[in-house]
Curated annotation (Swiss-Prot):
Residues 1-25 are annotated as: Disordered. GO terms for cellular component: cytoplasm; nucleus. The lineage of its organism: Eukaryota, Fungi, Dikarya, Ascomycota, Saccharomycotina. SUPFAM superfamilies: P-loop containing nucleoside triphosphate hydrolases. It comes from Saccharomyces cerevisiae (strain ATCC 204508 / S288c). Residues 14-23 have a biased composition (Basic residues). This is Uncharacterized protein YPL245W. It is found in: Cytoplasm; Nucleus.
Amino acid sequence: MHGPTSKAISRNVRSVKRPRRAPRPVVSTQAMNKLSNVTLSAEQEKLRERVLSFMRSNLSQYKSDWKHPAMFVIQGDAGTGKSVILNSLFNEIQKLSQFSPSSEDILHGTHNYLVVNHPEMLKLYIRISDSFKYISKSSLERPTSLINNLQKRKVMADVVIVDEAHLLATSKDAFKRFYGENHLKDLMSLCKVLVLVYDDKQALRMGSYWDEGSNNGATLKDFYNEIPPKSRDWYTLKQQFRVAAPQNVLNWIDQISVAGKIPPIESVLSKGNADCADDKIKNFDFKIWDDCGAMYEAIKEKDRQYGQCRMLSTYDFPYRLDGKDYYVECGDNFKVRWDRYTPREVTPWSERCDTIDEVGSVYTIQGFDLNYAGVILGRSIGYDAANDCIKLRPELYDDRAGFTKKKNIHNAEDVKQKIIMNSINVLLTRGVRGLYVYAYDPELRERLLRPSKK
């Protein structure tokens, strides 16, 4: 039997009056709740008000012949609540820009943007905007898009807030349609007030390399010092909100991922925090494993119990964006595929049920929390027996794009080492309830588990 002709179908479609589609409900995720439904601490609330006061003061004094915007930097290690403050701050200034108790408020009628150079984080902010009536999706941008947009329209923003400013490009990237020399430099020419959240220990690529301790890439303080003292401010957050671990575990993470030293195993397995009043800290689950397959089984069990427990690895196993599956292999009993590239996926990788069958990279998990993180220290991370410390082997690190040399990288080998250390730091600071660690290198694995000599 033949169906109706295409013309008949066309007429039928036009003749039917379709009902208006109902708004899509906002499905809340843990990542959304942790960023938007959080009561600020006393320090965070005080900082938010300090930034608001800074904005008002500098907007009211702004003159068109100024060469630089006012700049407020919020620095802090991973997990210190930087993005939580930004989300609250941006919601407040957007509310004041549209509906202010006083039309004389300098923020009334302002045009403001929140920028993040991280696709997963941008998707999260866009989803959160559905729950905040004052935040429009058009005010949330990747830096290149905003720069190109403002330059094309020849307009200036009032306030630009940058989350994860350590991911801003520090060199030209024609592939991503950025033709300037530095994202921050261009943003500084396109706004009156700039607020940056920053942690140079999370810079992961030579093309967006920020380092306050060398002449490689870019240094935020160089830009900051160009601004007159009255138009700049810098605040450092120190309280850890994500990793609810005792201080000895936090020290272990810092020693491994920043100093490259190997603390005694007893220092993290001791019960020195038994008297801690905070049960979350007292019960933080830390373990170094000698069997990656067994660690994975434990992570799956924790995922059934708590959810959001995942395997992670340094970028030490091959991966290409060619549509094929690539695998992380450790020993005889662990072969799990890398996370698949899914740009259309709305739910964060850490919260999708299917990703328990994957290993996440530093790019997948940066900016997000897990309840338990099972971290594989891959092939590029070995052991220097002579000096009893971490030994890095950059030639085994497989992030080719991350190691693409730029003209402002003067000591490429030093930068490669720092990028690997930064990636370790990002991975080790994801777990809220627990951290499991496995070292691919057998000598390092044995050393991490070895008791100190008495």
